[in-house]
C-alpha cells in the first residue's frame, strides 16, 4: 500500500482527527490518529495488517513465533498481524501500571516475538511492552506498527517496521504554538480518564 492509500483508509473511517490533543506520551498535537476507528472494519483491519506484515523482511517474518501487543490500542492490529503471519497473537496489559501477560497467556523461554502497536510516538509504551515480553521469557526480534508518528526518529532497541511514518509535530506542554495554547486539549487515547 502507498502512503496515500493508507491515509485514505484513515480518512474514510474518520480516524484522522484535527484539533488539540494530549497524547498518551504527555505531548500535544494538532493531529490524532484514532486507530480504533480505522480498525473497527474487519476487512480494513485485515488489509492494513497484511500491508504491515509485508514491510517485514521475509527472513525475519519466518522467524516470528508469536505476536504480542500492548492493550488496548494494539489488541486488534496485533490479532490481525497474527492472522497475516499465521501465528498466535496475545497481549500485555497494565492492571497495576506495569505491562504483564495475563488471562492465561504465556511465552515459552526464547520464543521469538513480534511486538505490534497501533501508533508509536515516543516509543515509551512499546519499550515497556518489550520489557514485559522479555520478562515473560520471550525474545522480541522486531516491532511493527500501523503508524510511526516519530517519522523514523524512535529507537525501540529492535528492528522497527511501521506501515507508514508520519511527521505530525508534537509539543511539550510548555512549547505549545499559540493556536494550540488557545484551546483546551482533548485526551482521546487509551490512557484517557473517563
Swiss-Prot record:
UniProt: orotate binding residues: 121, 149
Binding sites annotated in the UniProt record for 5-phospho-alpha-D-ribose 1-diphosphate: 117-125
Top EC class for this record: transferase
Keyword vocabulary terms for this entry: Glycosyltransferase, Magnesium, Pyrimidine biosynthesis, Transferase
A single MF term (Gene Ontology): orotate phosphoribosyltransferase activity
Coiled coil: none
Catalytic activity, as annotated: orotidine 5'-phosphate + diphosphate = orotate + 5-phospho-alpha-D-ribose 1-diphosphate
Record bears the keyword Lipid metabolism: no
Recorded superkingdom: Bacteria
Pfam family, one: Pribosyltran
Pathway note: Pyrimidine metabolism; UMP biosynthesis via de novo pathway; UMP from orotate: step 1/2
InterPro entries attached to this UniProt entry: OPRT, Orotate_PRibTrfase_bac, PRibTrfase_dom, PRTase-like
Keyword Repeat in record: no
Subunit structure comment from the entry: Homodimer.
Function, as annotated: Catalyzes the transfer of a ribosyl phosphate group from 5-phosphoribose 1-diphosphate to orotate, leading to the formation of orotidine monophosphate (OMP).
Family of this protein: Belongs to the purine/pyrimidine phosphoribosyltransferase family. PyrE subfamily.
Name the record gives this protein: Orotate phosphoribosyltransferase
Organism: Novosphingobium aromaticivorans (strain ATCC 700278 / DSM 12444 / CCUG 56034 / CIP 105152 / NBRC 16084 / F199)
Amino acid at each position: 500500500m502507498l502512503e496515500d492509500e493508507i491515509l485514505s483508509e484513515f480518512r474514510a473511517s474518520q480516524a484522522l482527527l484535527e484539533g488539540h490533543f494530549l497524547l498518551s506520551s504527555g505531548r500535544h498535537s494538532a493531529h490524532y490518529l484514532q486507530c480504533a476507528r480505522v480498525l473497527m472494519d474487519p476487512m480494513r483491519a485485515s488489509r492494513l495488517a497484511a500491508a504491515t506484515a509485508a514491510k517485514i523482511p521475509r527472513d525475519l517474518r519466518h522467524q516470528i513465533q508469536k505476536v504480542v501487543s500492548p492493550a488496548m490500542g494494539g489488541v486488534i492490529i496485533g490479532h490481525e498481524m497474527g492472522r497475516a503471519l499465521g501465528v498466535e497473537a496475545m497481549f500485555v496489559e497494565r492492571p497495576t501500571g506495569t505491562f504483564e501477560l495475563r488471562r492465561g497467556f504465556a511465552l515459552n523461554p526464547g520464543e521469538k516475538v513480534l511486538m505490534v502497536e497501533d501508533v508509536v510516538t515516543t516509543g515509551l509504551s512499546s519499550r515497556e511492552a518489550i520489557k514485559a515480553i522479555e520478562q515473560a521469557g520471550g525474545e522480541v526480534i522486531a516491532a511493527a506498527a500501523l503508524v510511526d508518528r516519530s517519522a523514523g526518529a524512535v529507537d525501540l532497541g529492535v528492528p522497527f517496521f511501521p506501515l507508514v511514518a508520519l511527521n505530525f509535530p508534537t509539543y511539550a506542554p510548555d512549547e505549545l504554538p499559540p493556536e494550540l495554547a488557545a484551546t483546551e486539549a482533548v485526551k482521546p487515547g487509551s490512557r484517557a480518564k473517563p
